Amino acid sequence: GSTSKEIINEFSKVVSVLNHGYVIHNQAVSLMKSSHVLINFLFNQSGYSTMISGKLIEYMATGNPVLVIGDLNSEVSDLMKISPNSSICLSNDTKSIKDYILKMYNLWIEDKLESKLPVGIEKYTRKFTSKELCNILKAMPK
């Protein structure tokens, strides 16, 4: 995916931002794992439930803290509860966003920012969900 220049410019006002642009998947996973905090923006379409993206699952699977900007009443919000040091904030809640980033920054400065795999994240992997789908299809009457 891509990130708009406006978003990069806004974040650059308060934190150091390094935009790698489009990279191949293996490099993307490596960059995710090497990051201290990952930020995921949820597409918000009124009247529709926010879907849980593969990208968010990949972010969570790194064990690194994840800040999600999106709907607090979505399935994503429920999923975020299993991810230690992670948070979800509304896009207009700049105080909560700032507080979260500052908290993660202070943990990083104190060398206390830890990666912790969310308990149960493996059930959201492509491998696991594909296996579950196969089991459902096999159980269907022919």
Language-model features and meaning:
Residues S4-V29:
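Nucleotide-activated donor-binding/catalytic signature segment of Leloir-type glycosyltransferases, i.e.
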Residues G1-S2, V23, M32, N40, ...:
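Membrane-embedded alpha-helical bundles of multi-pass transporters/translocases
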Residues V37-N40, E58-G70:
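Short hydrophobic beta-strand element within catalytic cores of glycosyltransferases
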Residues V29, G54-N64, S77-D78:
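Short alpha-helical segment that forms part of, or immediately flanks, the ligand-binding pocket
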Residues S16-V17, M32-T50:
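Acidic donor-binding loop of glycosyltransferase active sites
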Residues N92-S96, I109-A139:
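A charged, aromatic-enriched C-terminal amphipathic alpha-helix characteristic of glycosyltransferases
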